[in-house]
Amino acid sequence: MCKIYKGFLLSFQTQKEKGRGTDREGYIMKDYIITTDNNADLPEEYYTQHGVGCVYLSYTMDGKHYSHENFMPVEEFYAKMRAGSLPTTAQVNPSDARALFEPYLKEGKDILHIAFSSGLSGTYNSCRIAAQELAEDYPERSIIVVDSLAASLGQGLLVHLAQKMKEEGADMEETARWTEEHKKNIVHLFTVDDLNHLYRGGRVSRTTAVLGGMLNIKPVLHVDDEGKLIPI
């Protein structure tokens, strides 16, 4: 059975399983894993050390496609951007999300996925679709997909705090509920050297980019309550 609750998908467990940890008053703790995407900007070592799963967005630059297996070094990436190259990103599609989720389901684990803001990408929706499809194939498992309404280390902070709760013994529903209730407390404040990159990537309006360039103004940007990038 599936239910939409406060913006995330929850596929309820249909039966109790043996062999799981037991919480207070005999409640059987279901084993689960936290997953996210690489927009959280967490180090690769973090995913390995804490057992957090990650799905990766790909990008194209100068006609060449780059995926997780062949991402160019960061220094080279930004050197190309300064020289005028513009990367275009591709959102995670449902099959990508399914490839991340399904192995954990086969291991008997439930999944809490904290996704890149739906106001900046279709990645959240792709993960939600994959979760709905997998709920039919694995009715005994649970998948919760949370729209973080955040990006970069704002999203990464939510992932880290959720993982900390998990490691301290919180169950998946409790961790998901806390994440959902506190995600709008994340504050993003930053600026960039060149607004044209954000404009060409569809992240800020043409007016913001043109005026900022003409006046040599670098506005402070933030992510609003709808998960969209706007200047203050």
Model-based region annotation:
Residues 8-28:
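Short, Lys/Arg-enriched N-terminal segments with co-localized hydrophobic residues
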Residues 96-127:
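N-terminal glycine-rich phosphate/adenylate-binding segment common to multiple enzyme folds
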